[in-house]
Amino acid sequence: MSQSYINVIGAGLAGSEAAYQIAKRGIPVKLYEMRGVKSTPQHKTADFAELVCSNSLRGDALTNAVGLLKEEMRRLDSVILKSAEATRVPAGGALAVDREGFSQMVTELVTNHPLIEVIREEITEIPNDDITVIATGPLTSDALAEKIHALNGGNGFYFYDAAAPIIDVNTIDMTKIYLKSRYDKGEAAYLNAPMTKQEFMDFHDALVNAEEAPLNSFEKEKYFEGCMPIEVMAKRGIKTMLYGPMKPVGLEYPDDYQGPRDGEYKTPYAVVQLRQDNAAGSLYNIVGFQTHLKWGEQKRVFQMIPGLENAEFVRYGVMHRNSYMDSPNLLEQTFRSKKQPNLFFAGQMTGVEGYVESAASGLVAGINAARLFKGEEALVFPETTAIGSLPHYVTHADSKHFQPMNVNFGIIKELDGPRIRDKKERYEKIAERALQDLAPYLDK
């Protein structure tokens, strides 16, 4: 092959992982990232793998599908997981990170690799012949997005994604807050703002009547269920939030709680949780409160939450449009393009949803781009693993109804034999089998 390097376009979670996986296999990489010369409305820095939504990489237990995926990625030497572990902050049973520290570490590990050349410029054309991984994310620049859209025959979809506000912890009234993780799982890592029934009803009424920021497009609003704006959720029904981000189950009042409550109930009617957002513990985000309300409305409504009456918002919630491909028709299970075989795609644009899933797609695409470069057979991870089931799902789903997908046990191949009724035991067996089946792939 005349090509002496592989291109990776985009240094987000997927692109950073892809570049790292290619370089560790001894192949030079040209990693293109436009931030630094051109930014996006949602990004705040030029660092790689910047987290623009939550700072949580979700559950860490093997009985959680994303926890299994993370363990598989650790064993495959993921630079994203390596950086996350080094910058983690307390979050109960979840893996949450110091947002800035995490991105800075990914940037350093990737930039300092001797085989990776970082080029800060916007790419507006798709390479015709060079092996290239395109991982420009849901915020792909307009010029390149048009080329990708044309390459794929105009087939593509979109949904709207949102981020939650971040608050200065020193402006929270801690007399109205208690520290606890749900069901006391892990360390007591969340600040909990309890509400009485009347407080919740007043909050719900203010939320559903608050003014939203206008969209920049006349297209129909479509949301990914896992990142739905809190005001959209509230409009679905008065109790919808009580089964979502304001669920009180497992968050009983502490014995010394002196605030208002409904009678002698040991559990609040509703709870708003806040999660540590940086290593210093000076910033907290409101868990599950992604929003597209106008900034003034966010301050007015969210300051109704007990303890947040005088809260200072260091970042208000924002919403952006995410585009993704018709992967079932356009991509092979290795994330290789069916239309232009020198191209691989990775990240949210492929229809995987979530930080960890995006990085996992970059890992798979990077490994297979390297194998194509070396003239080796493509590597398809087994469907009994999380990292094999996710690419299989997004490339084999029904194209007519295809929507972004988080990793979950429902897409991993079922166990042989009679179905185990106990969910925890069943998930443990699936995880055990997954790690066994992954073992032969670790040195490839």
Swiss-Prot record:
What does the UniProt entry say about where the protein is found?
Answer: Cytoplasm
Binding residues annotated for FAD, in chain numbering: 10-15
For this protein, the Enzyme Commission number is: 2.1.1.74
Q: Which GO terms describe its cellular component?
A: cytosol
Task: List UniProt keywords, sorted A-Z.
Answer: Cytoplasm, FAD, Flavoprotein, Methyltransferase, NAD, NADP, Transferase, tRNA processing
Q: Which GO terms describe its biological process?
A: tRNA methylation; tRNA wobble uridine modification
The cofactor(s) it depends on are: FAD
Write down the top EC class of this protein.
transferase
Similarity annotation: Belongs to the MnmG family. TrmFO subfamily.
Task: List the protein's name.
Answer: Methylenetetrahydrofolate--tRNA-(uracil-5-)-methyltransferase TrmFO
Source organism per UniProt: Streptococcus gordonii (strain Challis / ATCC 35105 / BCRC 15272 / CH1 / DL1 / V288)
- The gene it comes from is trmFO
